[in-house]
Amino acid sequence: MNDVKSILLVGVGGQGTILASKILTQGLIENGYDVKMSEVHGMSQRSGSVSTQVRFGTKVYSPIIGEGTADILVSFEEMEAARYAHFLKKDGKAVVNTYRIPSMPILTGTRDYPDDIIGMLRQRVSTMALDATGIVEKVGNPKSANVVLLGALVKAMRLTDIDWNPIIAKTVKPAFIDVNRKAFAAGMAAV
C-alpha cells in the first residue's frame, strides 16, 4: 500500500513558503512520519518563484514530486497556482491565496495577469480559494499569510490530530508565536 502523500507549496520570494514548509515538516516528523523535503529558491530575492516539495508517509524514498502526482498544491499567490497546477493529480486539491503579486512583464504592460486562474483550477481539481492576506490582517501581522495557508492545508489534509501549537512555538521567533498561532487557527477555520 502506498501511503505517501505529496504536498507542493509555491509562492513568491518573501512570502514565507519555506517557513511554512519547515513548520509542516517538523510537525510531521515529530508525529512519526518519514518526511522528505526539497526547496527551489529560484530568483526568490527578486520576487521570483519559490517552491517546496514535502512528501510524507510510512517510508519515503525521494522528496521529488513528479508532474501529475501531487496530492495538494498550496499556492501563496494566484499566478504561482497556474504555473504549478500541472503537478496535481486528477483527484488532487488546491489551496490558493487570492492575493496577486504582478510580475515585471505585467508591471511594464507587456503581459496581462491571466483571467480567472481560480476558475481554471476548479475545472481540473477541487480548489479552495481564500484571501489569506485579508484574513491575516484581522489577526494582526500581514506577514503571517503563510501560516494561514498552512492552517488551511492541515485541515484539508486532515492532519488536525497533531498539536501544531508547540511546533509553531519551536519554529518561529518568540515574538511571533502568538500571532502565528492565531493565523494558523484562522486558516483552519477558513476551510
Q: Which sequence ranges carry the predicted segments?
A:
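Active-site cofactor/cluster-binding pocket
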Residues: M1-V191
